[in-house]
């Protein structure tokens, strides 16, 4: 179904894609016949919900800031260079399943966050709308899972049981929604960081840095890790 106002050029920018042009566009993508002129027009419709939690982000620095609306708040800067503005009106949430039962971060507010902590958030009007703490770096807590199963988009805190000779495949142990210990083999080919408790620093890392006994945060989709953080 084509929205009635798709031809409103004040609301939508219409671009022409040449047949010889290679380009990557966000889904979904709706194509429309440009008519007798023969050119193919494309309207890009980005329907990603702002209500969906982000991939977990590692905090690099917290500071007071003023946004473009002259609102005083908190600028949360993340490892990797991204940042987000947090005002006074934030809905604090907790992960599901046994996560909140095995570690309690319910009293942690944005002003309590610090270097190394890991959060997820949603935005509205370029500000944090909802926020949940995934890991406090000084209180990592026991192994646990967020979600009914890790096959869905979710997080787990797991222990590394063994690492294959190829340095990329690891067997990890976590606790499922029923409290039972589970073992899973995972190919670690995602963005990876290592938090070093000896100096409090966060380093770019890789699967080859995994060691037996490491405790790790794994954010994955259908067992395919998107982010791994090694705590050592």
What role is predicted for each listed range?
Residues 1-232:
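...the same signal can extend to comparable exposed beta-sheet modules
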């Amino acid at each position: 179904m084509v929205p009635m106002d798709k031809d409103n050029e004040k609301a939508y920018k219409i671009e022409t894609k040449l047949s010889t042009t290679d380009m990557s566009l966000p889904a979904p993508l709706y194509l429309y016949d440009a008519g007798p002129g023969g050119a193919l027009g494309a309207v890009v419709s980005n329907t990603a919900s702002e209500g969906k939690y982000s991939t977990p982000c590692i905090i690099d620095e917290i500071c007071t800031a003023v946004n473009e609306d002259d609102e005083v708040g908190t600028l949360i800067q993340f490892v990797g260079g991204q940042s987000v503005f947090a005002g006074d009106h934030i809905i604090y949430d907790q992960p599901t399943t046994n996560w909140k039962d095995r570690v309690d971060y319910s009293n942690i507010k944005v002003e309590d966050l610090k270097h190394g902590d890991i959060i997820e958030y949603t935005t509205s009007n370029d500000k944090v709308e909802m926020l949940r703490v995934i890991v406090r770096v000084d209180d990592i807590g026991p192994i646990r899972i967020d979600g009914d199963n890790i096959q869905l988009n979710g997080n787990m805190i797991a222990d590394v049981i063994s690492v294959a000779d190829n340095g990329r495949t690891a067997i990890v142990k976590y606790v499922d929604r029923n409290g039972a210990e589970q073992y899973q083999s995972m190919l670690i080919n995602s963005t990876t960081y290592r938090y070093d408790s000896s100096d409090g620093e966060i380093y770019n890392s890789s699967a080859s840095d995994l060691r037996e006994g490491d405790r790790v945060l794994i954010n994955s989709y259908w067992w395919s890790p998107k982010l791994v953080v090694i705590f050592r």
